[in-house]
């Protein structure tokens, strides 16, 4: 009898072990199958309790450091419609949710108001509001108007379907602006035929904390409040004191930089189509930057246009993908940049022999040039419809030169399309973060570099920490095993004493 009982116990124990192993195998296979299908078809579960995107700790950290301590008069977030209308609209409810989270975090500072602009047109005009979907951020007499579109990012070529939510950054930037009325000014030069495809670069500089203004450097001196001077897509040269003009813009620029000024110069392969800009090119050579030209068979000076069919998002190879240098200060500055870096219709920057290589940088006296963005090694230069040059190292697309004796900075970008709406506001590109990081490296403080947009296709669990997610996974595996084990013990005990 003892032998028979022992065999039964062994048999039942074996069944229990087999069931336990079987359940473990099923759980593992189910987990692997669901994971594979989720990755293949983009399945995800939004774990946010409100089914919306919560404000991140990074954003709260920015507000704690740069906004809340200065908001003595309080911050008002004004939605320009009735509350029920805002909540009923799915898109606007995203924005309202973010505002409510901020108001809950800072109840003594941030207040939410609802204003029907159709019933109160006078108040709407005072703020400059033109649509009921606008949102006003105000502090005392200072205010900023955000359009509904400002809170979202859109993919290239699609202005209707947003790809990411940009709410916390838009609110943080607007709040920073209204509590900092003495913000530095970024002046855009306008007397060299400059033209902008859109306002994306200005919006990016506003995000960085600048006010925007324009400057005719031929008629006026560079103002004392100029925190940044920008020349974007010029069609003509800067003037120098010669027989043609008694006013030298070059001298004004030099005097500005001698006092620690910051200068950004954006050009493209089309900039020098009618020939070089002798004055500004000669001056920039002193800062380590020259632009490559080629003289054609008929003696016509032609500007290099960079092409790389292996690293391009267009078939012609002229819409380049840039890369961060692997050495030098540029690699350190841009170490945290992710996303695709796009530079189209770019010309070639060449560093003159007066600058000596030094661990990835180039040095001349008190000035150091750091490449920030380069092409891949396979890129080549074309001019006049023919290939004219190729280098094993690739070409520099963006450079930053700094003078340690004056703290002046000169950033040169060889692609105007690096700073247009499609790249600065399009989802998936890292151009905006790159630009903000460059401004920070130039000395601009309080730049919201760490504030990120939140993609709608994001499968990140925003609420759970990694440790919490791991504990839940362990529990989901262990609980079925524990249940089967307990059940098996109960069966064995009942049979033992039956």
Task: Locate predicted features.
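Short, surface-exposed patches at the edges or C-terminal ends of soluble domains, predominantly
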Residues: 2-498
